[in-house]
Amino acid sequence: MTKKVIRKPDSLHDVFERKGGSAPTATHYCAGCGHGILHKLIGEAMDELGIQERAVMISPVGCAVFAYYYFDCGNVQVAHGRAPAVGTGISRAEDDAVVILYQGDGDLASIGLNETIQAANRGEKLAVFFVNNTVYGMTGGQMAPTTLVGEVTVTCPTGRDPRYAGYPLHMCELLDNLQAPVFIERVSLADPKRIRRARRAIKRALEIQRDGKGYAFVEVLSPCPTNLRQDAEGAERFLKEEMEKEFPVKNFRDRSAETEPLIRSESDFSRESLDRIFQIREDSVPDPVDDPEFPEVRVKIAGFGGQGVLSMGLTLAQAACSEGRHTSWYPAYGPEQRGGTSSCGVVISGERVGSPAVDTPDVLVALNQPSLDEFADDVADGGIILYDSTTASFSGGAVRAMGVPALEIARKHGTARAANTVMLGVMMALGLTGLDEESFREAIKFTFAGKEKIIDMNLRILEAGAEWARENIEGEL
């Protein structure tokens, strides 16, 4: 014999301690508001499906922003319109989570419209409950994207005029044009019969999430008697005779039976996988050895994207690592593949590196004029600037500056793209980093491993740069 039990669902708190105030068992919603009904329907479905421990409720700005007062599950409050973005992140990071977006029309259909469409188009694993009461409820009843033509609100006191404000936005119809959504339905809370139908749709949307099948969207036509100045009968009549006429209550799509669970590949950030991807070998990067006698050297390399700025820094860092020095490499570059500003900082130290950022370099390598102009004043007292005199000029300053015809030397030895290697050779010959010359040569081999012709050419250019430095600069330091 079945026993009838009248109580709140387990997925809703019995006492709303988070809400506080003098009425801890009452919600903050107005009398006659549809949110309370919808909360119960969602809570009951969560209980029946056994998903309470997996559920994460996302509540953005609006009347339901305090949903975490009531739902006994994971809860995240988000900025206005950003529920789909946050929900996507949670769903993808926690693949087993049942992610529920609870949004109003002033949120989902306005500031959050683009993110809603994009999430639906991607078929994200989200159950979206869209509360349509035709107004911005929380802020006093202003016109919303779903406000009916002719409907009076605080911000359209003579009624919505489509000549100025357009027409009500039909979200179900809009999303039904997309391929990815699994389930789309519009329901109403106008009377008990309609509420029972709404209950079935809500449960189906959550079933789809339980089974990991993809995107489910339920639009809920809901009363807002306070802002629309309606009594109970007026609210019911408005839903049935006006809202349902504009927004037909029906199922637009249910592909759950033929849809397979959405299985995404698992991320693997293990050290072994990362080492394999980046071709890092234990024997190529020995553990650093503390050597307080070795002075810290901070190098900044700058130029255009495509000049080998970052690879020069990596090669220098590899040379330092091979000698067991504490080393960091820190890149900074724009979005352009070629031509944009690019720089990197390399710190070589006998002790643990405190910060990889090189704000006051001991050595500045500038491969073009803009980089020389931008960073020359940052060089530390006693530091040195190496710049490509083929493309830049320096009028002098408080630090030593040496013009190196790097581009000219590189062209002479086979390729203009190796001006960065010329600069490495100059640094090697001048001993600016305290590293052995052989470490530079081995670093070149490591950087271009498997490309023997490129290795041979860069080794020749490295030596050419070093030879030029010995003949033209070495005696000046």
Swiss-Prot record:
Signal peptide: none annotated. GO terms for biological process: organic acid metabolic process; sulfur compound biosynthetic process. Keywords: Oxidoreductase. Its EC number is 1.2.7.7. InterPro entries: 2-oxoacid:Fd_oxidoreductase (IPR051457), Pyrv/ketoisovalerate_OxRed_cat (IPR019752), Pyrv_flavodox_OxRed_cen (IPR002869), THDP-binding (IPR029061), TPP_enzyme_TPP-bd (IPR011766). Pfam families: POR (PF01558), TPP_enzyme_C (PF02775). The keyword ATP-binding does not apply. It comes from the Archaea. It catalyses: 3-methyl-2-oxobutanoate + 2 oxidized [2Fe-2S]-[ferredoxin] + CoA = 2-methylpropanoyl-CoA + 2 reduced [2Fe-2S]-[ferredoxin] + CO2 + H(+). Transmembrane segments: none annotated. GO terms for molecular function: 3-methyl-2-oxobutanoate dehydrogenase (ferredoxin) activity; thiamine pyrophosphate binding. SUPFAM superfamilies: Pyruvate-ferredoxin oxidoreductase, PFOR, domain III, Thiamin diphosphate-binding fold (THDP-binding). Heterotrimer of the VorA, VorB and VorC subunits. This is Ketoisovalerate oxidoreductase subunit VorA.
